[in-house]
Amino acid sequence: MNFSESERLQQLSNEYILGGVNSPSRSYKAVGGGAPVVMKEGRGAYLYDVDGNKFIDYLQAYGPIITGHAHPHITKAIQEQAAKGVLFGTPTELEIEFSKKLRDAIPSLEKIRFVNSGTEAVMTTIRVARAYTKRNKIIKFAGSYHGHSDLVLVAAGSGPSQLGSPDSAGVPESVAREVITVPFNDINAYKEAIEFWGDEIAAVLVEPIVGNFGMVMPQPGFLEEVNEISHNNGTLVIYDEVITAFRFHYGAAQDLLGVIPDLTAFGKIVGGGLPIGGYGGRQDIMEQVAPLGPAYQAGTMAGNPLSMKAGIALLEVLEQDGVYEKLDSLGQQLEEGLLKLIEKHNITATINRIYGSLTLYFTDEKVTHYDQVEHSDGEAFGKFFKLMLNQGINLAPSKFEAWFLTTEHTEEDIKQTLKAADYAFSQMK
C-alpha cells in the first residue's frame, strides 16, 4: 500500500501537535516506529485513509465503536440534536431518559452521574469511595489501565505490602504512596495486601474482565473472593467497566459474571462514539457527591445533550435481537481461523477471546495475568501488525490491546482477515 500522504501529513502534524498525535497510543512507537496512518472517513466496519486505502478496522477507536463507524441511526440522532443545540448548562430530559435506560440495563447503578471520559469516571469513584469510608489508600491490579489521572498512574511495588511508585513523570511520590498494586487473578496477593494495610484501604479498583492487557477473564471464584475479603474489611469494590459495559451483552460484565460491585465507572461504548463517561452505584454511597454530599464533582460538558442523544440511540441499536449473538459468532470464526493458521505456520502464539473481542499474544502461555503479556514477543507483534496493515487490516499498534468486532463486520471480512493473517504468518518464519 502507498502511505505517502499519511507520511506527509505526519511531518506537518509534528510541527503543531506534540509528538504528532493527541494520544501516545496512536503513534507506532510500540510497533517499530513509522508514520501512523491518517484516516479520513469511517463507514461500517471500514476506515479509509488520506491515500485512498481501505481497511477492515479492528481498532474501533480502542473500543467505543461497537455498531460500526457512522451508524445511520446514531448519526441521525446526533444531527437532529445538533440542530437543536449541543450544550445548555441546564438539566435536560435526555439525561433522565438515558439514565433510566442505563439503570434498566445495569441494576447496580442505583444513582448515576455523567462526566466526559473514563478517566474522569474512575477518578471520581475513587474520591467518592474515600469520602464514604474516610480512608485514603486504594488497591489496583497490575496492568489494568484506569485512565491518566495521577491517582492510577502508579506502578507496582515489590510485593503486596509495598507501596507503589509513580508510573509517569509528574506524578508525586505522595500520591503513589496511597496506591497498592497486586497481580490480577492472584487472590493470595490481594488477601495479603488487605491483611497488611487493613483499615487504611478505601477501595479496590477492578476490571471485572480485563481489557487493557488484552482480553483476560477472571479465574473462577476470584471476583467473588475479592468482594468478600473487601467487604469484610470495610473496603468498597469499584468496577472499571469503561471497556466492558455493553461490550459482551446488553448490560455490564458484572451482571454477566454475577458479581456486583459497590460503584461502577463506565464510558467508551455508551457514548455512541462521542465523549462520555459516567459512574454510579449504591445510593447511600452516591449521596456523598455534591450537591447532596461533601465530595465535589462537576463538569461544564457533563451530561451534554449531544452525548446523551447519541447514547440513547446507541442503546436502541444494541437492545435489538441477535446483536451479541452475531458478535460472538464472528469472534468464534476469527479465533478458530487464526488458531488454525498459527498451527499451520508453527507460530508461537495464543489467543484470548471473549465474545466479539480477542487478543493475539505472541507467547506460548495461556494469558491470565499482566507479566505474561509484558514478556510476550513485542517484536513479533510489530512485524505482524505492519504485515497486516499493508494488506488493509487495521489493528491497535500495541501487543497489549484487543481486536474489537462490530455489528457491521461480516463473514467476508473475517475471510479477508484470515487470508491476510495467512500471508503475514508466512513471512514471519
Swiss-Prot record:
GO cellular component: cytoplasm
Pathway membership: Porphyrin-containing compound metabolism; protoporphyrin-IX biosynthesis; 5-aminolevulinate from L-glutamyl-tRNA(Glu): step 2/2
GO aspect biological process, one term: protoporphyrinogen IX biosynthetic process
Cofactor(s) needed: pyridoxal 5'-phosphate
Catalytic activity, as annotated: (S)-4-amino-5-oxopentanoate = 5-aminolevulinate
Superkingdom, taxonomy of origin: Bacteria
EC numbers for this chain: 5.4.3.8
UniProt-listed Pfam families: Aminotran_3
Positions of post-translational N6-(pyridoxal phosphate)lysine modification: K268
Sections of the chain in a coiled coil: none
Keyword match Isomerase: yes
GO molecular function per UniProt: glutamate-1-semialdehyde 2,1-aminomutase activity; pyridoxal phosphate binding; transaminase activity
Keywords for the protein's UniProt record, in alphabetical order: Cytoplasm, Isomerase, Porphyrin biosynthesis, Pyridoxal phosphate
InterPro entries hit by this protein: 4pyrrol_synth_GluAld_NH2Trfase, Aminotrans_3, Aminotrans_3_PPA_site, PyrdxlP-dep_Trfase, PyrdxlP-dep_Trfase_major, PyrdxlP-dep_Trfase_small
Subunit structure and binding partners: Homodimer.
Family recorded in the similarity comment: Belongs to the class-III pyridoxal-phosphate-dependent aminotransferase family. HemL subfamily.
Protein name: Glutamate-1-semialdehyde 2,1-aminomutase 2
Source organism of the structure: Staphylococcus aureus (strain bovine RF122 / ET3-1)
